[in-house]
Amino acid sequence: HLEETLKREDPYRLSTMAYHGNQIYNKIGLSNITDISGWNLYQGWYENDFKSFDRFVDEEHRKYPHRPLIISEFGAGSDPRLQSLEPQIFDFSMQWQQLYLEYYLPAIMRRPFIVGATEWNFIDFSSANRQEATPHINNKGLMYNDRRPKDVFYYFQAFLRKDIPVLHIAVDDWKHRTVVSDGEAVEHPVKVYSNLDKVELSVNGKKLSVQDIENCHAGWRVPLVVGRNTLVASGIYQGKKVEQVSDIFVKMQPRYIAAAGSGQLELAVNVGSNCFFTDNKSDLCWLPDQAYTPGSWGYIGGEIFRRSPGRIGTTAEVKDTRNVPLLQTKRKGIKAYRFDLPDGDYEVELLFADLNARSERVTYDLGAVATLDNADFRGSVFNVSVNGRPWLSHFSPAIEVGGNRCISKKLRIAVTGGNLTVDFEAVKGMTFLNGIKIFRIH
């Protein structure tokens, strides 16, 4: 018995054992063996919501008030190619990881019966069997695998260090932004991590406001213009001024492309996703999906694909693409995708991947569902037409390339009616679309 051996060798050494968040360990008595219980808790990541963490640890303390516990693992994954203004559970956006950790750290620290915690993990690391947004990499780190700090690293530093000033404009993970705008400027959120009492932020020489720092961060809506935007954050630490400077580089995409004129146009959409996705080889930004509105662009019909309940997209690795996260989401049951735009010659590119192929459940995914009985499981067949012109007949991505594999289809078309509309008609199962890009040739 390991516990008996430990106490015989060193009666003063405390013992611990780690479990995932399931009551089975209490029911069979395993959690009574060691001095300290270690719980690997990921509520708000693999499953449930943040408040489920509070309920779990508080109930543990209520039932076992004399048993100290540690949070032996907590964390959320992130991919710098994925950014979101509306982050959600398990989307691998940098913003959801920040929200997760901003909730967990104070929740842990304000409970004295939690005697320790380990954020999983300090640095992104190799993990051979992991799939998800960055295959074979566990991306829950506070630093990237090349040891560059993520912005959220400075939240931990601000929270835990009182001996030095911490002031960080949290834009390093998203310095190059493509924003959708109705005019020449657009407001975007900017966060500052700090252990100061107050911080003032300015942009391009214009002071915005002074914000109180709560939970080691504050946020601003910052007006950004095309090109370089210089941000300056300043505050007082022990009577001395502290300052940090950072830049954001912005490209604008007009919301109403029909009214924007007949200039150069390249517009890519991350269909079925709430995230901006930036191809780190081409620097092309695929914009979050949106419903169609006259004069603009967007989907008509359908719904977001969820491989497991409560999660957007799938965690399965998609082959035949370097842009795995772009293909891990889709819109299913889609009727059409429409762009209102100037007449001219365009290239249309559609991206597809059948995400219902069976994949082995991996042990680290504590909230996964092994299979999902969707109508389009490896068998969807549908027709695709553009502006009434038949294009793909009885098309099945699964039949052409197999499940969880990317296939791209391109077409050149002359637009003469002020809109480019891609229509989808189901033959068997459900229609779906993972990504769409249009490019004006002339």
Regions found by a protein language model. Name each.
Residues 1-208, 212, 221-224, 237:
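Extended substrate-binding grooves/exosites of carbohydrate-active enzymes
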Residues 201, 235, 384, 388:
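Short aromatic-centered micro-motifs
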Residues 202-211, 241-243, 389-394:
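Surface-exposed loop/edge segments in extracytoplasmic proteins
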Residues 214-219, 403-407:
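Aromatic sugar-binding surface patches on proteins
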Residues 222-228, 414-416:
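Surface-exposed, short loops/turns at beta-strand junctions within beta-sandwich domains
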Residues 228-237, 420-425:
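Short, aromatic- and glycine-rich surface loops/edge beta-strands on solvent-exposed regions
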Residues 237-245, 430:
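Short, exposed coil/turn segments at beta-strand boundaries within extracellular/luminal domains
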Residues 250-442:
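Compositionally biased, intrinsically disordered or flexible polar/acidic segments
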